[in-house]
Curated annotation (Swiss-Prot):
Record field: pH dependence: Optimum pH is 7.0. Activity decreases sharply with increasing acidity or alkalinity.
GO terms classed as biological process: toxin biosynthetic process
Documented EC number(s): 3.-.-.-
Tissues where this protein is expressed: Ubiquitous (at protein level). Highest levels of expression in digestive gland and crystalline style.
Protein name per the record: Carbamoylase-1
Length: 17
């Protein structure tokens, strides 16, 4: 199960991919 787009975007920003 993938996290919501809103949260996923923030996580990607923090992780930096």
């Amino acid at each position: 199960v993938r996290t919501p787009v809103t949260v996923q975007t923030k996580v990607d920003n923090i992780k930096x991919y």
